[in-house]
Amino acid sequence: MRKISILVISVFLFLGCKQKSIVHPTFYYWKTDYQNKKEETSYLDQFKSKSLYVRIMDVDFNPDLQLPVPISPIKFSDPIPKQIDIIPVVFIVNEVFNKIDTMQTAVMADRIVKFVAAKVKQAGKQNYAELQIDCDWTKGTRNRYFKFLEQLKANPLLKGKSISVTLRLHQVKNIISSGVPPVEKAILMCYNMGNLRKYGEQNSILDQHEMDLYLKDYLERYPLSLDVALPIFEWAVVFRNGQYAGISKRIGTTQIGDKKLFKQRENSILYDLLVDYPAAGLKKGDVVRWEQISTEDLLSTSKFLSRYLSPRDRNLVFYHLDTDLLKHFTNEDVQKVIANF
């Protein structure tokens, strides 16, 4: 009986002492003009961030030129703080890989590397250790996308640097058709997982049901080392006559809380527009689904992920660095999320 008691105690001690990841919190910077704003930089200091993921540009296919071209590249009005390393991020529209062959992907890889190097210097940095490629690849584009990644790795300007990619939930579950990118690590994008265009009450930014469906039985077996990206953003999804009409960048917390403009449905995230609102291109009768993220959402998501991610050094990246978004979360809130890993 004594031996059984010791065994039971040992099991409980083992379960209670599950090894934790060493988490390095930081942010994405997704604006087109980098300014070293005191309030935003204070968040980097507050969370002892050592790096910042900075969107350098989008890449899309230009039908007139018949070439992939840079879209809205960032400019640096200020240098990035000396104590912060830059991790450049390039977003590539998936359709690009349906339009070009492997010879063109080689040219694109070379141009991206040179463009990134120039932008990193504009940011006040002489070098960088990691380049991240953001692309929601599919079964149809994976071969050319993976070839492009191989071409990047072979570029002499990237010698000694690592390449990471973004990873969506469907690419984890559908690993056979999606394949595994030929890179050192990926970052799991835990947002934009619901059906944005479907009319209804769902929060398309973060949906626990979708996470269960796509990750519960698959995440633990994913072969790459994984960092994690979590959302802290909010947006206004507009519907007209029950049909998706877009995301309005002119609707924020001030507008959605204006009772002369909107009437919130009871116990709902749907808001009816009471008058025409030309400043946002909206008409009376339009419906806005106001989607936002709470501390409780982040806590439940981080707890869920911690069950299936192996303990290791891991970047935890919040999307994105913006004072208006971060004011919804206290330092204590964020520290609790970090502690869950």
Predicted features and spans:
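Chitinase-like catalytic core of GlcNAc-active glycosidases
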Residues: 60, 64-182, 188
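Substrate-binding surface in catalytic domains of secreted glycosidases
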Residues: 150-252
